[in-house]
Every structure is written in structure tokens, then in C-alpha cells.
A protein has these predicted regions:
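Penicillin-binding protein/beta-lactamase superfamily catalytic region
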Residues: 484, 548-550
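Short, surface-exposed amphipathic charged segments that create phosphate/polyanion-binding patches used
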Residues: 286-287, 418-423, 541
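An often Trp-containing, charged/polar helix-loop segment at the C-terminal end
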Residues: 410, 449-452, 495-548, 556
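Ser/Thr- and Asn-enriched, surface-exposed coil loops between beta-strands
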Residues: 121-123
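Fungal secretory targeting signals
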Residues: 1-23, 297
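C-terminal, well-structured subdomains that either form a transmembrane helix-short loop-helix hairpin
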Residues: 477-494
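Non-catalytic alpha/beta scaffold blocks inside enzyme catalytic domains
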Residues: 400-437
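Substrate-binding/charge-relay-adjacent region of secreted/lumenal peptidase catalytic domains
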Residues: 22-117, 126, 131-406, 433-480, ...
Length: 566
């Protein structure tokens, strides 16, 4: 059992009378920004509008946790594979008693009563106040903002302050300056068209039909993925679901009957709910993204128990449940060993403080032996989605160093898909595990795109997989989809199959992947053609070795097994 601070006891200890007017504390600006061009101010909310806010408390020792993460994730380390327990992670990630006391006392002094701990380590304080009270507390001006394209409205502010004497205890207040665009369904479905593209076949001998329609059989041929069933019931593969995208069991049955006839058509997945998420079953409720993600995990990671984690609309974390799903998994004693997500944002949407906090949540989960994979995005160098820009826009969480970013390829000869998002973070520094590979690329790149990206930032993606003309079944009909949304579940399936064999051999699972990946570039098919245009440029070119379009390349299952010591 994790021993965390008792907020009830602390609140009682910190209680002071709120009948008297508290002394105004000196304030310090915590964050500020301008209105993003995709949003417009819509005036002041009513003074009594209720705002659900969260304060992210400073965590005890995230530098220590980062060292521990790399110790257990770097193959050359004597601690490799000795993943941390929930209790061990909590010792790093929980706030200090001093921080809890100080922030709780300040809130109570100002008449805030409903103070609730949240997060797996009680590292957030949640509370609700009126808009007028929030203005007073944070020396700010909350406003209504509207997302111009969708019409969705948010209450946010462009600047807020916190007491100077609490700066050492508070990472951020949220949601305040975060302006995330509504999540959208990435892949677009089209009807399969007969015929094949004129593309050269690759050495592993996938049939030329795979140039036009990608199926599980194509992936098995291209990457050497086995069809034999996994054997370890403790090995779990998690699939994130958002924005009311529902994975259909009927569509999965049809998919398996058509494209994996060697598997029982009754093979299915389990469902886990976060924030009241559901998984409604009907052809009308079919979700292209959800069906894609489930069909290319259940249908590729043969026999691996798969969990569809559906995040509902009942979230107040300001980022569509991205915080809540990681908090939910972090609170579990045995979370799935692999998690794939095919959604994301642009890095500037979150701001550096929130991006860092979410990224650190991935660190806590990775330290426990969870491989976290995200689709890199579909906007080339212009971000998660194609958009106008003058300088390159990093996707999020692409720039986070504690997850694995997956780009896209196409064709049997595997060239870079032109939409594959990649580039360099403006928030996160380049981690040591990729320093050599990225330096080599930048030296070869020379002055190309100079001034349009941050060459010292964390570079992404890390690896890639097929992402064009991928066949799925949706609403009872077969069709083709494209996007890095295809690539992440495919690579996640490969990792899960390797984990199955590791567990069977009595070895630890791969866990946080990146140090292992960059230490073993020979375990991937290097992609040397294509680019990811955007921002009125040709983007970055793919080339020998790592590149910011396809990363280290696509999986070679046999070589990855060897690298894993199997």
C-alpha cells in the first residue's frame, strides 16, 4: 500500500479562521501568454460561474526519479530491468508535507473549503471556486474564449500569479493558460481500390499487393511478426480511447474473420473506464480511430490481452482526459506493460509548465516498466495536424523525452509518409540516449531549415511503422485509413509480443523503450527516402540513421528479439 499524506489530517492541522480578512500576500506572475490565433476572447464569464481548478504541487525529487528511470531502462546499466514499484515511485513523486500544508493553508485563509487531493501521489489539489473568487486568488482576469473553428468555449486566462512564498511549492495552476484545440479524429477512411502501386518490394518479400492495401499479413511479412499466440496472461496491452470513439466488437469479429482467419473470431478485448467513459456498441457508434487501434493490436499482437481504456467527457483536467488516464494507470498496482495512444496536441497549446507536468507523469509510469507510445502526429513539421506556420511546430507529446514517438512509412519498400510529424521540442532538451544519433543527423542536414526549429531540443519520432492504406472494418464496412494513428498500435503490438517472450523466459519487460531503441539501431529497418513537408518547406529529409520523419526506422522483429536477449 502506498503511504501518502492524509489531506484530512493536514487540512485540520493547517486550518485557520477564515472569518477575518487574510493579509494580502506578495504575488509573483506564474505564467503568461498571448491568445492563440485559433481562439478568440468572448468576454467575461458571470461572476458566479464555477471553475474547477487544480494546483500541481511540487514533487519531492523528479531529478532523482529521472536518474532511476534511466538506470532501469538503459541496457548497459547494472540496474537494467529492475523497474520500480508504485511505492518506490511515490517516494520521488509525492509532494512534501510542507508543500501540502503551505498551499492548503493559503486556500483556507481565502475561504476555499472543498480542497480535495487528486492524482496517484496526492500531487494535485483540486477545488472549485467562482470566477470572481479565482480572479481574486490568482490576481488575474479569467475570460470566456471560443475555439473559432469548432465553436467550443473555455474559461481561461492569459496570465495568473501565485503568492511569492508559495512559488517553491507550486508547479502550476490548471486549467489557466492552456489553450488546447479540441481533439479530432485523425484517420480518414476510404474504400479500398483494386490495383497496386509501382513500388519496389523489400527484402523480406511482402507481396506487392501490400503497396495498395496493408493488412496484418503484410505487417507479418514486412517486419517478421509471428502469428503464434502469446502465452503470458500477465502481459497486457492498453489502448487509449478519447472523444467518444467506441471500439466495436462486431467490427473486430469481421476484421478477424477477413484478415486473421487463423484466430478465433470471438477473440476480443476488455474495457476500462476513466472519467465515466463508455464503449457503446452499434454500427452508428463505430469510431474509426478506436476500431483502427483495437484491430491493429488484437489483430497483430496475437493472443496478448488487450484493454480498451475509454476516457469519458466527465473530465475537468483541461486536456481532454490526458492527465486523468495517466493518473488512473499510475494508481494501479499492475498497469498494462504497454500503452498506445493515437491522439495528441501541439506543444504550444499546453505551455511549458503543463507540458512538463504531463511529461513527468509519463516518467513515473515508465519507471514502473510501462512502455508508453504515441502517434507522432499527421502535420509533418507543422504539428499534429497540417496548418499554416512560418516556423516548425512540435507536436505534443512528441517532444517529451519519457515516451516513444511513432512516425509513419508507406509502401513495401518503406519510404517516409509525407504527413509523419517530426522535429524538435521547444520545451524539452535533447536527452542523452539520442544525442549521438541526432548530432549525426544535424551535421548532415547543415543549414537546411536553419532558424525554423530548435536544434538542441528533444528530437522525435523515435521509430516508425506502416501508416498508409491500412485496412480496417468500421460500421460493418471495410475501408482504408492513413496516419501515424496506424503506426503506434502496430509498433505497440510488436513490443507486447516481445514482452510476452521476456515474461515467459523469466525476464523483465522492456519498459521505457528509448534507451534500448537507440542502443540497438541494428534492430530496425532504416528508412532513407521521403520527407515531412510543412510551413512552406520540404520539412526534414529521411536519411541513413535516425531522422525526424521515421526515427530509427521500422521494427525487425527477429533483430529486436536478439537485442532483448532472446
Amino acid at each position: 500500500m502506498v503511504h501518502l499524506l492524509s489531506f484530512a489530517a493536514l487540512a485540520s492541522a493547517a486550518f485557520v479562521s477564515v472569518t477575518a480578512t487574510p493579509t494580502r500576500r506578495a504575488m509573483a506572475v506564474a505564467e503568461q501568454r498571448t491568445v492563440p490565433i485559433t481562439f478568440a476572447s468572448a468576454g467575461k464569464p458571470a461572476a458566479d460561474t464555477t471553475l474547477d481548478l487544480r494546483i500541481a504541487l511540487k514533487q519531492k525529487d523528479m531529478e532523482g526519479l529521472e536518474k532511476a528511470l534511466f538506470d532501469v531502462s538503459t541496457p548497459s546499466s547494472s540496474l537494467y530491468g529492475q523497474h520500480l514499484s508504485l511505492e518506490q515511485v511515490a517516494a520521488f513523486a509525492a509532494p512534501t508535507e510542507q508543500s501540502v500544508n503551505a498551499v492548503t493553508q493559503w486556500l483556507q485563509e481565502n475561504g476555499v473549503a472543498d480542497i480535495t487531493p487528486s492524482g496517484p501521489f496526492n500531487d494535485w489539489i483540486s477545488f472549485s471556486v467562482s470566477a470572481s473568487k479565482a480572479d481574486e486568488l490568482f490576481d488575474t482576469n479569467f475570460e470566456d474564449f471560443v475555439h473559432i473553428e469548432s465553436g467550443e468555449r473555455f474559461v481561461r486566462t492569459l496570465q495568473y500569479s501565485i503568492p511569492q512564498d508559495l512559488v517553491q511549492h507550486i508547479d502550476l495552476v490548471h486549467p489557466t493558460t492552456t489553450f488546447v484545440k479540441p481533439l479530432v479524429q485523425r484517420p480518414v477512411m476510404s474504400v479500398p481500390v483494386p490495383g497496386t502501386a509501382n513500388v519496389t518490394e523489400r527484402a523480406l518479400g511482402a507481396p506487392s499487393s501490400c503497396n495498395s492495401v496493408v493488412t496484418p499479413a503484410c505487417l507479418q511479412s514486412l517486419y517478421g511478426i509471428p502469428t503464434t499466440r502469446a502465452t503470458q496472461s500477465s502481459n497486457k496491452l492498453g489502448v487509449s480511447g478519447f472523444i467518444d470513439q467506441f471500439a466495436q466488437t462486431a467490427d473486430l469479429r469481421t476484421f478477424l474473420a477477413n484478415l486473421r482467419p487463423d484466430l478465433s473470431s470471438t477473440t476480443t478485448f476488455t474495457v476500462q473506464s476513466v472519467d465515466g467513459g463508455v464503449n457503446t456498441q452499434s454500427a452508428r457508434q463505430a469510431g474509426i480511430e478506436a476500431n483502427l487501434d483495437i484491430q491493429y493490436t488484437v489483430g497483430v499482437a496475437t493472443g496478448v490481452p488487450t484493454i480498451f481504456i475509454t476516457v469519458g467527457d466527465n473530465n475537468a483536467d483541461g486536456v481532454n482526459g490526458f492527465i486523468d488516464i495517466i493518473n488512473a494507470l499510475n494508481a494501479e498496482s499492475a498497469p498494462p506493460q504497454v500503452l498506445t495512444t493515437s491522439y495528441g496536441f501541439d506543444e504550444p497549446d499546453l505551455g511549458s509548465a503543463l507540458a512538463t507536468r504531463v511529461c513527468n507523469a509519463y516518467m513515473t509510469l515508465g519507471a514502473r516498466g510501462v512502455s508508453i507510445l504515441f502517434a507522432s502526429g499527421d502535420g509533418g513539421v507543422s504539428g499534429g495536424q497540417s496548418q499554416s506556420c512560418t516556423t516548425f511546430i512540435p507536436a505534443f507529446p512528441g517532444g517529451c523525452p519519457f515516451h516513444t514517438s511513432v512516425g509513419a512509412t508507406q509502401g513495401v519498400n518503406e519510404v517516409a509518409a509525407d504527413f509523419s510529424s517530426g522535429g524538435f521540442s521547444n520545451v524539452f532538451a535533447r536527452p542523452s540516449y539520442q544525442s549521438g544519433a541526432v548530432t549525426t543527423y544535424l551535421n548532415a542536414l547543415g543549414n537546411t531549415n536553419s532558424g525554423k526549429f530548435n536544434p538542441s531540443g528533444r528530437a522525435f519520432p523515435d521509430i516508425a511503422a506502416q501508416g498508409v492504406n491500412v485496412e480496417i472494418v468500421d460500421g460493418g464496412s471495410a475501408g482504408l485509413v492513413a496516419g501515424t494513428s496506424c503506426s503506434s498500435p502496430i509498433f505497440a503490438s510488436v513490443v507486447s509480443l516481445i514482452n510476452d517472450r521476456l515474461i515467459a523466459a523469466g525476464k523483465p519487460v522492456l519498459g521505457f523503450l528509448n534507451p534500448f531503441l537507440y542502443a540497438n539501431p541494428q534492430a530496425f529497418f532504416d528508412i532513407t527516402s521521403g520527407s515531412n513537408p510543412g510551413c512552406n518547406t520540404n520539412g526534414f529529409p529521411a536519411r541513413a540513421g535516425w531522422d525526424p520523419v521515421t526515427g530509427l526506422g521500422t521494427p525487425n522483429f527477429a533483430a529486436m528479439l536478439t537485442a532483448a536477449g532472446l
